[in-house]
């Protein structure tokens, strides 16, 4: 399995393309100059395209991915109705979802053979919208509205329209600020990182009454932390054994172990990392984690070690200015 790491640096308007070597190092393959401040990125389900959100002219760019070395070639672009804070796709590669924090909206862009074509739906009134996350069954879009302490739930239709479900939302505690989320591989649980109180919520997707329920909340910060809380990102290993969340004020990555059924988290440790880690990701083998320091202008590569899933630094690499996003593609 070949793996490629992509890092987005909006201040220098660049994407750095890296080969992830099996022994735990990165080799630079390409530096792409992007026509705009590049922020969120996602790889298409079929691994053929990298989709990139840019501003100040709000667009999604599509780059073809070389199956040989992961290098990028520009393919197409389409306008977006708001500044893209987060982008993702449905699991069939038919639609792109773009969450916009500033616009308080989520939009749906139709794809034709991997190429973004047109906006087919937009939902507004989602204050502080920070991500859009399709459920494992590809039916429900989870959209955290950070400023409203709620996660809105929409049914995705075959033509890409979003219909509010009943109930239409789940709510966090006041002041939590739900931001990003991941699903457990068993499709029974979701984990949400809350920006404003630096916590992680465990959501049971189908409790005995058929409802969505928050069953655990954990503080991701050390007990003696007394500064402003500013959590950012969350990711899970492919085997569902370990979860990681980061906080930007402390520049820490918190390491969690996950119970066998996915219902319980336990903190295993705290990993100091690059300054102001806004984004990170885990490779497809579950062996490595790559974190981006928005203020250090570097990425750090870690090996995930042992039963606890603790992190061992393998190297750090200069990228562009203000790196914010990391994605990994297996090809």
From Swiss-Prot:
Highest taxon above the source species: Bacteria
Keyword field: Carbohydrate metabolism, Glucose metabolism, Hydrolase
Name this protein carries in UniProt: 6-phosphogluconolactonase
Function as written in the Swiss-Prot or TrEMBL entry: Catalyzes the hydrolysis of 6-phosphogluconolactone to 6-phosphogluconate.
Family statement: Belongs to the cycloisomerase 2 family.
NCBIfam families in alphabetical order: PRK11028.1
EC nos: 3.1.1.31
Reactions this protein catalyses: 6-phospho-D-glucono-1,5-lactone + H2O = 6-phospho-D-gluconate + H(+)
Single Gene Ontology BP annotation: glucose metabolic process
UniProt GO MF annotations: 6-phosphogluconolactonase activity
GO cellular component, one term: cytosol
Keyword Hydrolase assigned: yes
Organism: Enterobacter sp. (strain 638)
Keyword RNA-binding recorded: no
Pathway: Carbohydrate degradation; pentose phosphate pathway; D-ribulose 5-phosphate from D-glucose 6-phosphate (oxidative stage): step 2/3
